């Protein structure tokens, strides 16, 4: 059995690649079913966020990572050359350590951000629901969650984290000196957009429009900040009002196109618009950036804002890395120990079989009236001979073949004392 992870993330691939290999909710169940049916995979699940797509796998034998990368390319119609250039592969203990780093927020663009742990738990739940988890990989997820909890409680990694939402609003504040006079249009109503709304409100924005596919959710979020709610189809009608547009949905296709933005700019008399597209795949067409009066940024453009704020938590990150390394080593120690369980069970069954056979023989002799002491001596002699016969034969054969290490294993296994050297 082997564990491995295939990772495409914000460090290895730009958003243009990441959006191609993203698994939306409509694709995830189908992808897991296809992977689950592969004979070279025992367990599998997928994590897909705006910053990463990762395949977590357990295989019955040596893993064939390239075959899985080929599958990923075929599924998303991306060339193998393009994918191989931006994939990181982690095996066994490195895979365990990587999963714990991801769950703890250490591998995130935003160091220590808490959202990733929830996303990892969703990936775990998806695998369980698909029937593609239930063994060592399942236990690794549980262990990773426990380590992530320790990192959160025993280090300062999560104190005042700078989120992608915060970074987006921070960039807007550099462009608009007085946010109270601005109107913000938020596309989506998930956790990230909710954080954006909170940061905008704290920054002084009081005119907020929330657009979402589910209008009731948009109304609930808008009500918290005294804003208004619209459906996605209403965006063209309201777009010209927005000075700030921040988008983060799970849509597989762009929601806001160049044509709609051009019309909005005309109605605004070309007053500039600031846009941040946090979504992967992107919600705003890339061509919108060609318009002279639009400042369009993607999640990758927020990196510098985030990195500037990460330096204060570098010490906490080092402490977290130590906890993660220890957690990964501990998991692999127990996982390797499990590999011996079936062998030890067969060994015990064999020994108990020898014991029962010799015991029955002794009972028959006692019932026949034989001397009890002689019967006990025969029982002890029979047990000793039967139990050590096969190991003795195998050790002698190994020594004759030059495999002296077997003798050392026997010494360690039975804690045999070193031979005394007679110097007389």
Curated annotation (Swiss-Prot):
The gene is hemA. Possesses an unusual extended V-shaped dimeric structure with each monomer consisting of three distinct domains arranged along a curved 'spinal' alpha-helix. The N-terminal catalytic domain specifically recognizes the glutamate moiety of the substrate. The second domain is the NADPH-binding domain, and the third C-terminal domain is responsible for dimerization. It holds the Pfam family GlutR_N. NCBIfam families: hemA (TIGR01035). GO terms for molecular function: glutamyl-tRNA reductase activity; NADP binding. Belongs to the glutamyl-tRNA reductase family. GO terms for biological process: protoporphyrinogen IX biosynthetic process from glutamate. Homodimer. Substrate binds at residues 49-52, 108, 113-115, 119. Keywords: NADP, Oxidoreductase, Porphyrin biosynthesis. Disulfide bonds: none annotated. Catalyzes the NADPH-dependent reduction of glutamyl-tRNA(Glu) to glutamate 1-semialdehyde (GSA). The record marks 98 as: Important for activity. It catalyses: (S)-4-amino-5-oxopentanoate + tRNA(Glu) + NADP(+) = L-glutamyl-tRNA(Glu) + NADPH + H(+). CDD domains: NAD_bind_Glutamyl_tRNA_reduct. Pathway: Porphyrin-containing compound metabolism; protoporphyrin-IX biosynthesis; 5-aminolevulinate from L-glutamyl-tRNA(Glu): step 1/2. NADP(+) binds at residues 188-193. It comes from the Bacteria. It is an enzyme of class 1 (oxidoreductase). Its EC number is 1.2.1.70. During catalysis, the active site Cys acts as a nucleophile attacking the alpha-carbonyl group of tRNA-bound glutamate with the formation of a thioester intermediate between enzyme and glutamate, and the concomitant release of tRNA(Glu). The thioester intermediate is finally reduced by direct hydride transfer from NADPH, to form the product GSA. This is Glutamyl-tRNA reductase. The active site is at 50 (nucleophile).
């Amino acid at each position: 059995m082997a564990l491995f992870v295939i990772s495409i993330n914000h460090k290895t691939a730009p958003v243009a690649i990441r959006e191609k290999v993203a698994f939306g909710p409509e694709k995830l169940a189908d992808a897991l079913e296809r992977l689950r049916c592969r004979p070279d995979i025992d367990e599998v699940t997928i994590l897909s966020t705006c910053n990463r797509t990762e395949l977590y796998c357990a295989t019955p034998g040596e893993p064939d990572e390239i075959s899985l990368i080929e599958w990923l390319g075929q599924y998303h119609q991306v060339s193998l050359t393009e994918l191989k250039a931006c994939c990181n592969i982690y095996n066994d203990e490195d895979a365990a350590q990587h999963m714990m780093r991801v769950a703890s927020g250490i591998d995130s663009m935003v160091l220590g951000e808490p959202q990733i742990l929830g996303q990892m738990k969703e990936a775990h739940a998806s695998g369980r629901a698909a029937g593609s988890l239930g063994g060592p990989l399942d236990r690794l997820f549980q262990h990773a969650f426990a380590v992530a909890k320790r990192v959160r409680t025993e280090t300062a990694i999560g104190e005042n984290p700078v989120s992608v939402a915060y970074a987006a609003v921070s960039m807007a504040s550099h462009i608009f000196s007085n946010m109270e006079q601005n109107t913000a249009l938020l596309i989506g109503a998930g956790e990230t957009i909710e954080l954006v709304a909170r940061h905008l409100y704290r920054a002084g924005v009081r005119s907020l429009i929330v657009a979402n596919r589910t209008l009731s959710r948009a109304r609930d979020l808008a009500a918290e900040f005294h804003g208004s709610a619209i459906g996605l189809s209403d965006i063209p009608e309201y777009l010209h009002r927005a000075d700030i547009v921040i988008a983060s949905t799970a849509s597989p296709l762009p929601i806001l196109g160049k044509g709609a933005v051009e019309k909005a700019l005309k109605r605004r008399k070309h007053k500039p618009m600031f846009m941040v597209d946090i979504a992967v795949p992107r919600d705003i067409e890339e061509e919108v950036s060609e318009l002279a009066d639009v400042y369009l940024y993607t999640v990758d453009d927020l990196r510098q804002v985030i990195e500037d704020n990460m330096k204060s938590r570098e010490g906490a990150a080092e402490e977290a890395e130590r906890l993660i390394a220890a957690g990964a080593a501990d998991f692999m120690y127990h996982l390797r120990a499990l590999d011996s369980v079936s062998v030890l069970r067969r060994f015990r069954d064999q020994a108990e079989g020898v014991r029962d056979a010799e015991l029955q023989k002794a009972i028959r002799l006692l019932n026949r009236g034989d001397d009890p002491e002689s019967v006990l001596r025969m029982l002890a002699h029979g047990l000793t001979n039967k139990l050590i016969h096969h190991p003795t034969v195998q050790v002698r054969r190994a020594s004759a073949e030059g495999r002296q290490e077997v003798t050392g294993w026997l010494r360690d296994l039975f804690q045999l004392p070193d031979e005394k050297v007679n110097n007389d």
